[in-house]
């Protein structure tokens, strides 16, 4: 009877906010290489609790019959490359055996915006929702709960293996009959970043009948009750802060608040479309607001706010979700831009990508410059553009110590030759993207009245011409960006998809990155068939 009552409350909460949230299907994009996070999340939420399967895909989830290791509290969404996060794993279990792994198979599973549930074949039933910094669980038909502070996604023991996450240290402590605290410190992952620490505070509404902690890695707690509500506060600063991040609201109240919050955002765009089209549209809109994540007040290295992390990567988002956020929620984009400036103030460069409180990895250009220029062009208020302009100039002029982490690689060659020669990784991509970055710097310089700098960077924005090869033909089309040596000679053969000079599958794609001056040749161009295909 209790379960029926809880289901009724859940569906009431869902129906109240169903006007737009009902169209969001978290499963879209989650299978294969999509790697979209399927669990509950607040907009730009720091905590993203969800299942982690044994195969350890980037966002944790894999379809049945893949076994589930447990539910961790931190995830990214829709990312490629190596894994990141998957910290602080909890797993309900039946029986009394104390093991360090409890992989279990699902017999049923439900997911919707802000809500996830599954039944294990072994018996336990799990429901999950979340606040910005606290995961909320409702367990039924369990005997105990296993807490693992030392595991995570993409774990690897090979020292300094590229893109692998590696264990640094952990601690776990049982505080009385209702609370467990601890932390997990991990380094590496997709951006090859330095160590980051995730602190947690777990609180149960049922007392522990029995509790054991071991090796500063694991804890097991047993219950007399078969229904247990658990909250897991998360912090990147301290266990005390994790405890403060635990919300007072219960499962259903928090779910209702989450749905109301999302509905307000999704309702900013209304479309006249079929149900299937609406489902695709609002799910895509929802996905644009999962990252970056708001960690204001949760930075262990400095206190300036706002602070956002998990820019994954600005190379991808400057032309997609970032301009959209500027239009839909300008106050949010203002905070994101100011966060980029705060990162520059404290670490020396704005990121092109960032995760786990570390910049990296750069993709094609210094693309935070484009985000600043977009905000400036749209008149976004509350930003010190003169100060932001200094960060843009540093990107353009000062070579970083580690060009994979931040800044512009090959900047000396770019500024002296007017292009980056092959032999330097991503030479073609970087030349094209630095040209557009410089065009963006020029626009901000003009708007701020820096006329000499405007002329300088406008001229440099034409550097892509130095890699334009008008006689190169590919699949019946002619005229493309192509790699060139420091001696001025062209690289005649490029194995597309395998070249370090241009990291794309065809010469078309870097050519299309010329947002400020694309050459498509007019009506009589050999590019006409391609133009017709992409329209």
Model-found features: residue ranges?
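ATP-dependent phospho-/nucleotidyl transfer catalytic cores
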Residues: 437
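Accessory carbohydrate-recognition regions in carbohydrate-active enzymes
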Residues: 19-370, 376-432, 440-466, 472-478, ...
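Bacterial Sec-dependent N-terminal signal peptides
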Residues: 1-19
């Amino acid at each position: 009877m209790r379960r029926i009552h809880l289901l009724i409350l859940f569906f009431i909460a869902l129906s109240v906010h169903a006007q737009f949230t009902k169209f969001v299907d978290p499963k879209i994009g989650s299978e294969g290489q999509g790697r979209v996070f399927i669990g509950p999340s607040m907009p730009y939420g720091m905590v993203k609790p969800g299942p982690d399967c044994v195969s350890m895909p980037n966002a944790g989830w894999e379809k049945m019959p893949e076994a589930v290791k447990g539910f961790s509290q931190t995830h990214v969404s829709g990312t490629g490359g190596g894994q990141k996060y998957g910290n602080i794993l909890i797993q309900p279990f039946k029986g009394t055996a104390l093991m360090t792994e409890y992989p279990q198979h699902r017999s049923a599973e439900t997911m919707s915006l802000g809500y996830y549930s599954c039944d294990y074949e072994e018996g336990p039933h799990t429901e999950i929702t979340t606040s910005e910094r606290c995961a909320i669980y409702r367990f039924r038909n369990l005997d105990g709960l296993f807490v693992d502070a030392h595991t995570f996604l993409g774990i690897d023991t090979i020292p300094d293996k590229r893109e692998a996450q590696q264990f640094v240290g952990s601690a776990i402590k049982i505080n009385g009959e209702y609370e467990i605290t601890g932390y997990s410190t991990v380094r590496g992952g997709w951006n090859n970043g330095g160590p980051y620490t995730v602190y947690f505070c777990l609180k149960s509404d049922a007392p522990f009948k029995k509790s054991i902690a071991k090796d500063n890695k694991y804890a097991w707690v047993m219950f007399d009750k078969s229904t247990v509500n658990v909250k897991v506060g998360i912090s990147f600063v301290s266990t005390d802060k994790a405890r403060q991040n635990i919300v007072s609201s219960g499962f259903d109240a928090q779910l209702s608040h989450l749905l109301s919050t999302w509905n307000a955002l999704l309702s900013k765009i209304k479309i006249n479309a079929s149900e299937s089209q609406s489902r695709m549209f609002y799910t895509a809109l929802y996905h644009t607001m999962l990252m970056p994540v708001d960690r204001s007040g949760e930075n262990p290295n400095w206190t300036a706010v706002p602070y956002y992390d998990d820019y994954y990567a600005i190379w991808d988002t400057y032309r997609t979700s970032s301009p959209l956020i500027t239009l839909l929620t300008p106050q949010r984009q203002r905070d994101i831009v100011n966060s980029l400036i705060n990162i520059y103030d404290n670490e020396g460069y704005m990121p092109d990508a960032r995760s786990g409180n570390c910049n990296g990895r750069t993709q094609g250009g210094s693309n935070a410059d484009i985000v600043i220029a977009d905000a400036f062009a749209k008149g976004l208020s509350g930003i010190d553009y003169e100060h932001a302009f200094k960060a843009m100039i540093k990107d353009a002029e000062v070579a970083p110590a580690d060009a994979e982490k931040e800044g512009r690689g090959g900047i000396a060659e770019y500024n002296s030759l007017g292009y980056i020669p092959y032999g330097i990784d991503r030479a073609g991509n970087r030349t094209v993207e630095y040209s557009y970055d410089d065009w963006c710097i020029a626009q901000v310089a003009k708007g701020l009245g820096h006329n000499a700098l405007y002329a300088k960077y406008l001229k440099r924005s034409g550097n892509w011409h130095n890699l334009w090869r008008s006689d190169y033909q590919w699949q019946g089309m002619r005229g493309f960006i192509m790699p060139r040596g420091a001696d001025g000679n062209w690289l005649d053969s490029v194995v597309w998809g395998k070249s370090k000079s241009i990291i794309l599958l065809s010469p078309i794609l870097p050519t299309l990155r010329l947002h400020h001056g694309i050459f498509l040749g007019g009506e009589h161009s050999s590019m006409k068939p391609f133009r017709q295909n992409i329209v």
